[in-house]
């Protein structure tokens, strides 16, 4: 494919219209100039032709990205760089033209930030490899990958494919556009900040070199952007692969391997893309399930949504719970979790009972509502006057009978086990 005149494809009306629609669809926060995505249309109407001419003449200067720190589950922070809306628009236009070119080069076992690919496909491929006897895992952790990409190495790799100097020029300008941290400017000497529309593609271009090296060595692997695992047949082979691939990453790609987090392990000790793995002795194969940390995160969020002191209606709590349940199961549906779903269902119902019991407030109101739900008057009276120990009351059999699964479903609650059973691909 001729890649010597790509700038005109990038600046074509059709490509720019698609880029605009995508940026507006993604919404997103303002960059350093404070412009909102809703203001982009008017801005481009006035300045679009000027921007196009600046890009053609290599005179366009991207603005610095705005640094935003996102807390990590492990206690650290992830640095995001938020470009201006205008720069997101231009980056999106570039990515739309470059992506089809690089899709022809990318490895079939690379799944992150690629069209029609997802984390679940990576997990299923990894399971296939494990069940073919490759049940020693090399889990390589790249230390602050997006913050440490070497610009010269990346541009050299891009230059092997892209021959349009105008495109090469603007991509490099985005890499060195700088960062604003609390109103202080900082040069971006290395890295491709997460948050830009080009960043995922540039990450895959860089790490495709790793994919090619692993393929050349005949290794079984899956990669989701910078999250890579290699499956081999023995512990000795796994340790050798860890040494050799780590050396390649550091010496050839100029990246840093975090040796304290990288490890050689069995599938049972692995956490990958939120999934854990176990060996099903009946089926004689490895299977996936939500990792314990993913379950703990779900429970924490569920507890927040069912907090009795949260001053919103119970119907609103159910609405938010349903969003959490659907999103979580949609992601983990390829995993085995029937028992887990039943346990979580029971926990959710228990916490909603406490919310409802508190909402009923007075003993008289509680007696009336329990009787409406079919509870005998004497039992309703005893239950209502048990005391203020809401957690204790809502564990009693009478409450399980009065506010049961069917009644909560009628109230609008999505049952995890029912939703999972409908969607599950492994049941």
Region annotations inferred by a language model:
Residues 360-427:
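Extended C-terminal regions of large enzymes
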Residues 88, 92, 96, 100, ...:
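Short, residue-level hotspots on alpha-helical faces of the histone-fold
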Residues 54-69, 73, 108-117, 121-271:
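Conserved polymerase palm-domain catalytic core
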Residues 26-33, 73, 102-106, 135-136, ...:
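Short acidic (Asp/Glu) and glycine-rich catalytic loops that position anionic groups and cofactors
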Residues 30, 34-100, 104, 113:
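Active-site substrate-recognition loop segments, prototypically the cytochrome P450 B′-helix/B-C loop
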